[in-house]
Amino acid sequence: SKLEDVAKALKDQGYKAILVEGHTDSRGRAKKNEELSFQRADSVRSYLVSRGITAEKIKATGIGPSRPVATNDTAEGRANNRRVELVVTPE
């Protein structure tokens, strides 16, 4: 899986800190999107920790719909906006 590959690369290359950012599309209520984006990020964080990433060095945060990478006017754009991004601070 992609996340398995990410975990392996992080362990191989090292890291000082990792921020897992969850994102949503703009549909639905703002509060629900914030919660969903955090749940999405926290799920990835938990998986990476289960694969050997140091829990104290990885944090999850929910961004909600505030930073889209595509339009929210199409199904494809909304799908692209429902994502998780990793911000890695190297050692």
Regions found by a protein language model. Name each.
Residues 8-91:
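Periplasmic OmpA-like peptidoglycan-binding domain that tethers envelope proteins to the cell wall
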